[in-house]
Regions:
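Histidine-anchored nucleotide/phosphate-binding helix
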Residues: 14-28
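A glycine-rich helix N-cap at a beta->alpha junction
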Residues: 49-75
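Short, well-ordered alpha-helix to beta-strand connector turns
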Residues: 29, 63, 97-98
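Charged helix-capping and loop-helix junction motifs
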Residues: 20, 48-54, 83-86
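Short internal beta-strands
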Residues: 32-38, 66-70
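Long, hydrophobic N-terminal alpha-helical segment
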Residues: 1-6, 24-28
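C-terminal structural segments of small proteins and small subunits
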Residues: 74-103
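Short, glycine-rich nucleotide/cofactor-binding loops
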Residues: 3-16, 41-47
Length: 103
């Protein structure tokens, strides 16, 4: 299955659970992409209770594709949080996936 998870919130627990699901799907050999959008691009800074940074790194190590909206990153002056992308890529991911989840 091709799964797309869009994280559009910087709420650490939401992002943490999204990456937990993405990791589970990757473990089951699904083709998984996570796209950070809106304030979701800020979630990788979290190293607190939910430590989104670590769980996102685990996702990448499993071969998951992690992308962030370049406009969202630039407007927050975050630098390189992960590979930068755009809405054209998000559109393609949505069009090609079997399931899309927005959190």
């Amino acid at each position: 299955m091709k799964l797309l998870v869009v994280i559009s919130s910087n709420e650490p627990e939401n992002a943490w659970n999204a990456f937990r699901l993405a990791n589970l799907a990757a473990d089951k050999k699904d083709d998984v992409s996570v796209f950070l959008l809106n304030s979701g691009v800020e979630c990788l800074k979290d190293v607190g209770k939910h430590n989104v940074k670590t769980i996102s790194e685990q996702f990448a190590q499993k071969g998951g594709k992690l992308l962030a909206c370049g406009t969202c990153v630039k407007s927050r002056q975050l630098g390189d949080v992960c590979p930068i992308s755009n809405l054209e890529t998000l559109y393609s991911l949505i069009k090609e996936c079997d399931k899309a989840i927005y959190l």
